[in-house]
Amino acid sequence: MKTAVALAAFAAVGMLGVALYGIGGPDGNGEAEACAAGVQTAKAIESFVGGEIAAFQLARKPVDLSQIAYVNADGAATTIGENAGRVTLVNLWATWCAPCRKEMPALDRLQAELGGEAFAVLPINIDTGDAGKPRAFLESIKIENLPLNTDPAMASFETMKKRGLALGLPVTALIDKNACLIGHMNGPAEWDSGDAKALIKAAIAAAGA
């Protein structure tokens, strides 16, 4: 009788393990299945890493960034996943971050040149105050092509930090149309340079965006 009870309990634990394994999450097999294409795209563009973006790190395992939340330019709460559908360069920045301020014009020019149905730059400001300061900064340097998205709780940065992507600011992630990581970079870059644009164009082609 004791043996039968023990076997039943073991079977129940086994079934629970199967159920938990089947639930998608940050490290679950659901993420692996949903974002395997991001890793394939990363492999396809490996030869484009270098020059101005030599520090760009390609995704070696599936990473889903769709749940990263922020407030869009219209003041509505949203997520990266809700705005998926094209290759996107997600850039976390703050007004107190000098390298962030320096690279913002390059991101603006990149959006002006490549932005459209297949690609977009998605900046997320993580200043902890209201949006007045970052808005004034963008206006002062005449940013015309980028929206002011905000995350004063810094949850986006904390999420990327927990995923091993963010060491500081700025941090930039290239994601595919399903919000799956293709690669990321810590520190500033000349994002409108020939090297960066070649990498992004290759990602768009490889991802089928």
Segments (PLM) and residue ranges:
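N-terminal targeting signals for export/organelle localization
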Residues: 1-65, 209
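Short, solvent-exposed cationic patches
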Residues: 27-28, 102-103, 200-209
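A short beta-strand-turn-helix
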Residues: 57-62, 67-88
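Conserved redox-active cysteine motifs that mediate thiol-disulfide chemistry
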Residues: 84, 92-109
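Alpha/beta-hydrolase fold active-site loops
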Residues: 87-88, 119, 170
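Structural recognition of the beta-strand scaffold that forms the well-ordered cores
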Residues: 91, 122-123, 147-150
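Structural microenvironment flanking redox-active thiols in thiol-disulfide oxidoreductases
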Residues: 101-142, 153-160, 198
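Thiol/disulfide oxidoreductase modules built on the thioredoxin-like
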Residues: 141-145, 151-202
